[in-house]
Amino acid sequence: MGAYFGSKATSGLCQAIIALMPPHETYIESHLGGGAIMQRKPPALRNIGIDLSERALEQFQCAYPVERVHAHAHRFLADFDYQGRELVYCDPPYLHSTRSSERRYRFDYQEHDHLELLRVLKALRCPVILSGYPSRLYDEELSGWRSLELQVMNQAGVRTEKLWFNFTPDRVHWAAHAGRNHTHRQTIKRRAESWARRYAAMPPAERLAVLAGLMAVEAGE
């Protein structure tokens, strides 16, 4: 599926996006295309993929059930009945001004389409992650959002991808994806395994005390 123009199936990018995701029960991915993120992230209770291309929806494959929606992303997102435990990941066509390639999407975006999408995303009352190349337009429209830049490798070489998001990352939903990059993830994994071994070697009373202390931290006490 990496053949899709704009695919996120590039070195380190999928992991970084998934690691950023906060806890959620419903996952909505717009502009699904090849669905690189949907295919690689653990499933939510409900998973929804949106695309204007019927061909992309028909060809999309995933190890778990996904509701495939043939619709304009901004219309679906504006009309969806949000319950408070959703996460939206939005990967629209790159802005023309940021592209280094002449390749085009089957269903492309003009600037007014980007502005309409941003208007909808800003109004959503749930966590949103938006990806693209660094853009002054996005920075200005999403001035109150946080952002993160990543160096990734694609068919054209090394490019800078940018993520914009409307929440404060404070906990990782899936431990296997924790970390800024592969090296950081391996460091965290080794540290977690070391702490797990130490915890397993403790007497029951000490385990209980440590567990109570950790739960107090998570509760903000």
What annotation goes with each model-predicted range?
Residues 1-221:
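Class I S-adenosyl-L-methionine-dependent methyltransferase catalytic core
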